[in-house]
């Protein structure tokens, strides 16, 4: 296996989540139900309306008059939704980088369409977390994180994986909130890099200011 990169080794990842009830996990996972290789999240499909939708109900309950949520409102929305299940609610910092991941117009806020995309990703990441947490500890360790990242289609070197574990673990264990923060940052930075990797060969050139804009926001 070649390191590093995100080239042809990603597989065909697809998952259908829109329309699920709040807090409901993604259907059975495994080798046949995987995630999009580049982004590490399901391909989003806007196939359902807001009418009678519990996702929209929770979003609209905290959204401002502009129809968007900031990080604090997103945190409240996700906590009220119960999407974390038995895990601790998402921290404010994790909610900040969730918004940054999908903040394509740089407003520092998230509209409903972006929220639906986030909702799909969170359900998939949660199911992935539960799948690799084989001992049911509520945390993932180094070898379990390696499996989770592999299921998401990323090809990372052992050195990079070790760096990620050191950054997001507490005593060698990664809790769900930190795991999601890792997934968000991995997706966002990969998307940022991939847009500049014009030949899709795992290398890119960009200026310093562009680098700072892309990385400091996450």
Swiss-Prot record:
Membrane topology category: Peripheral membrane protein
DNA damage is among the record's keywords: no
Coiled-coil stretches: none
Chief location bin: cytoplasm
Residue sites binding Ca(2+) 2 per the record: 133, 135, 137, 139, 144
Compartment(s) of residence: Cytoplasm; Cytoplasmic granule membrane
GO cellular component, one term: membrane
Keyword Repeat: yes
Function in brief: Calcium-binding protein that may play a role in the adhesion of neutrophils to fibronectin. May play a role in the formation of focal adhesions.
Remaining remarks: This protein has been shown to bind calcium with high affinity.
Subunit structure: Homodimer. Interacts with SRI and LCP1.
Protein name: Grancalcin
Organism: Pongo abelii (Sumatran orangutan)
């Amino acid at each position: 296996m070649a390191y590093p990169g995100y080239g042809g080794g990603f597989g065909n990842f697809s998952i259908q989540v829109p329309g699920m009830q709040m807090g409901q996990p993604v259907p059975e996972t495994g080798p046949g139900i995987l995630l999009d290789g580049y982004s590490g999240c399901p391909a989003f499909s806007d196939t359902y309306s807001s009418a009678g939708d519990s996702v929209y109900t929770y979003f609209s309950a905290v959204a401002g008059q502009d129809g968007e949520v900031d990080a604090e409102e997103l945190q409240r929305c996700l906590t009220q939704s119960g999407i974390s299940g038995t895990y601790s609610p998402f921290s404010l910092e994790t909610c900040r980088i969730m918004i940054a991941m999908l903040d394509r117009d740089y407003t520092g806020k998230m509209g409903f369409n972006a929220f639906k995309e986030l909702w799909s990703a969170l359900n998939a990441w949660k199911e992935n977390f539960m799948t690799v947490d084989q001992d049911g500890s509520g945390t993932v360790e180094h070898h379990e994180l390696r499996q989770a990242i592999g299921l998401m289609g990323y090809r990372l070197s052992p050195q990079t994986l070790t760096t990620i574990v050191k950054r997001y673990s507490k005593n060698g264990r990664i809790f769900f909130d930190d795991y999601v923060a890792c997934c968000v940052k991995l997706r966002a930075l990969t998307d940022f890099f991939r847009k500049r990797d014009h030949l899709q060969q795992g290398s890119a050139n960009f200026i310093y200011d562009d680098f700072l804009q892309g990385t400091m926001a996450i």
